[in-house]
């Protein structure tokens, strides 16, 4: 809470006014973002809800979500950088080989590397069966990935040593439509023999979007030019595997609504306590001032309580779902049924 209040919250305005800066060499995040991420990593926060086997703390998903709510309420733009890594970790953990888990999870869990989700292309978003990004098999068992992905949140930045892209692509002999999609790990830098950052891969950011909001987070056009990729899961079953990432993102999207609702409520109640206007119907509440704060007026209180009710309702559903995700790990049938309802695959 102290980190969110004292470090992230002040950077929210900085991120919104300054935004990200694109150049051919990469993306520069707003002033202070990189330093805040360093503190976040040093505090061990990225590892909170991940397995101890890969350096995590092994705590419940619901506890990790509580931390993410504080981060997101303080600074959603900043929080998306480590937030998307969570989905990448879950996907590699669920579908990656033992070697892939060894290579990528320790770095992602520690926060040294971050992750992204690369689905959308210029000609297709919701209809992923139309995607054109190609994956050509190579003699060494890797794949050559070629194509363009758009609207990639945190696709390029200067906050971590490496960025691990989880990419949907199509094999040469793949069936048409969604039944012919495969999933790949495509890192910005290829890992070296020691597990650190090696040579640059054929991945680059072509531009960043100029958005209405969340200016502090880079929403990128990502170009894959014969980039080396590694298959996750079975061929042509990539969309099934990607649903692991998408369900993590669904919880994150719900959390975004909660974070903004909570922040809006906090701002509104602060203003209502400061803004003076007329007197209370039951007599002066601030007789030493020219008028009473508007929080004393019934209609203002009604609006504030409505805001609070929506935020609390959202919070209840998000945390209940996260709790069911935790219980699912122990194969409880009722929890499985509930998550199939709220996080459909």
Spans of features found by a protein language model:
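Short Gly/Pro-enriched turn/cap motifs at secondary-structure boundaries
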Residues: 123-126, 156-158, 175, 211-217
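Conserved small/polar residues in nucleotide/adenosyl-binding loops
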Residues: 339-345
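Internal maturation/activation junctions in enzymes
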Residues: 20, 81-85, 96-138, 322-337
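Extended amphipathic alpha-helical segments enriched in small hydrophobics
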Residues: 250-331
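A glycine-rich, basic-preceded beta-loop-alpha segment at the flavin cofactor/substrate interface
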Residues: 151, 190-206, 211, 218-249, ...
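Amphipathic, small/basic residue-rich leader segments at the start of a protein or domain
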Residues: 1-80, 99, 103
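Active-site-adjacent bridging/hinge elements
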Residues: 33-45, 64, 142-145, 230-243, ...
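A short core secondary-structure module
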Residues: 142, 146-200
